[in-house]
């Protein structure tokens, strides 16, 4: 399955309960984005080529899901409520069907819709977006992505009595001004997030960590990334519904010149 929103591979020939999704590697920028960022800066928000790292999973019987749209336009790894109402060009909060409940991600300008340009946090828009523009993005992009992922996880659980869901990302090797870490903080090669053991059975987390450390990569668990909405929303390790987030530093699979050339 493939459309303008996402691409799904392996769903028809699935033979193992493994699903990998890449929500932040999309590069098809909608015409109504109306940002004021240089594309080279805007693309720093992408998890560039992460989709190419994991798309093999369909060849071994798993399912691979990737977003085609950029996370700076709307981020499927955020709750629909993760936005600050005052960042909209609206005055009356009661007209919104969403009751906003922003997290620190929105405070950093990287919530449901990014309002800051990476890496230094300049304003993304000349004028604030409207509630209608926000809801169009939610309805056309965010909800369909979640619908497909949820359906795939549910079908896998129905067929196998369990699922192992890997939410795949990349990160810069140093924290930027838009991070909740101190700018310049050096990160490990990988961060594995299981929301402090609430989204995934720890044996699955340990399996991934031990494998990566066996390859001499540095690996941290749950810091600075413990997993956001896509790991949280559909997991329940007590019911064998396991979701884990993998953050890989970009230099483990690409270099800056690669980003600039694509």
Per-range role (PLM):
Residues 19, 27-28, 69, 79-116, ...:
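Active-site microenvironments of hydrolase-like enzyme catalytic domains
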Residues 144-251:
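Catalytic cores of processing enzymes, dominated by hydrolases/peptidases
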Residues 2-104, 124, 128-131:
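Active-site loop/lid in soluble adenylation, ligation, and acyl-transfer enzymes
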Residues 16-23, 111-125, 241-248:
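Short coil-to-beta-strand
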Residues 38-40, 126-141, 190-199:
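Short histidine-centered catalytic/ligand-binding loop motif
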Residues 106-153:
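Internal, conserved structured core segments that host functional sites
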Residues 252-258:
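Conserved small/polar residues in nucleotide/adenosyl-binding loops
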């Amino acid at each position: 399955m493939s459309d303008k929103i996402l691409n799904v591979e392996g769903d028809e020939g699935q033979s193992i309960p493994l699903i990998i999704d890449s929500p932040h590697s999309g590069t098809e920028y909608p015409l109504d984005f109306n940002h004021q960022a240089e594309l080279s800066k805007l693309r720093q928000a992408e998890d560039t080529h992460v989709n190419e790292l994991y798309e093999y999973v369909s060849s071994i019987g798993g399912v691979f899901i990737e977003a085609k749209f950029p996370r700076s336009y709307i981020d499927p790894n955020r709750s629909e409520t993760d936005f600050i109402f005052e960042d909209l060009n609206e005055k009356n909060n009661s007209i919104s069907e969403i009751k906003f409940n922003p997290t620190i991600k929105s405070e950093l300008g990287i919530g449901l819709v990014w309002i800051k340009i990476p890496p230094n946090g300049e304003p993304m828009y000349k004028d604030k977006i409207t509630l209608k523009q926000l809801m169009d993005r939610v309805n056309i992009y965010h909800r369909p992505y979640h619908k497909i992922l949820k359906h795939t996880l549910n079908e896998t659980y129905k067929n196998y009595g369990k699922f192992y869901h890997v939410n795949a990302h990349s990160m810069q090797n140093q924290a930027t001004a838009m991070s909740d870490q101190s700018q310049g903080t050096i990160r490990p090669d990988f961060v594995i997030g299981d929301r402090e053991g609430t989204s995934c059975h720890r044996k699955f987390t340990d399996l991934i960590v031990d494998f990566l450390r066996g390859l001499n990569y540095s690996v941290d668990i749950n810091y600075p990334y413990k997993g956001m909405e896509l790991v949280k929303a559909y997991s329940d390790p007590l019911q064998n519904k396991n979701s884990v987030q993998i953050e890989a530093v970009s230099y483990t699979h690409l270099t800056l010149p690669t980003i600039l050339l694509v």
